[in-house]
Amino acid sequence: MLGVLLVLHGSKIPEWKDVGIKYAEYLSKYFSLVEFGFLEFNKPTLSEALSNLLAKGADKIVVVPLLFATGTHFRRDIPRLLGIDNDEKKIRYMGREIEITIADPLGFDEKIGEVLVKRVNETYNKNY
């Protein structure tokens, strides 16, 4: 069964958890197993979110970093926190072999660009 694991950076500001909840709820309309975890500062951690997916029966997991570009978190921290080798992409859990695939960072997307235009216009209209 497919599990989706959203990765958020995290912050000492508690509102970050609200963002994770909202994105997980949105994706739950399309996928039955969705969890989110943070790289640092907040709970659930990435390993806690992974454990939740595994306990619910996921045997294939797509990890979706909510990051704009590759960097240390993408290349090193996410695989390390999930317990996978960059080349292997498999873990063992209670005798089961679990495949983990990490999606590319968000990068440039016109839909994200549209959100940026919307934010600029909202801010301008509210302040000028």
Curated annotation (Swiss-Prot):
The keyword Metal-binding applies. InterPro entries: CbiX-like, SiroHydchlorin_Cochelatase, Sirohydro_Cobaltochel/CbiX. Co(2+) binds at residues 9, 73. Pfam families: CbiX. The active site is at residue 9. It catalyses: Co-sirohydrochlorin + 2 H(+) = sirohydrochlorin + Co(2+). It is an enzyme of class 4 (lyase). Its EC number is 4.99.1.3. GO terms for molecular function: cobalt ion binding; sirohydrochlorin cobaltochelatase activity. SUPFAM superfamilies: Chelatase (SSF53800). Substrate binds at residues 43, 68-73. CDD domains: CbiX_SirB_N. Pathway: Cofactor biosynthesis; adenosylcobalamin biosynthesis; cob(II)yrinate a,c-diamide from sirohydrochlorin (anaerobic route): step 1/10. Catalyzes the insertion of Co(2+) into sirohydrochlorin as part of the anaerobic pathway to cobalamin biosynthesis. Homotetramer; dimer of dimers. This is Sirohydrochlorin cobaltochelatase. The gene is cbiX.
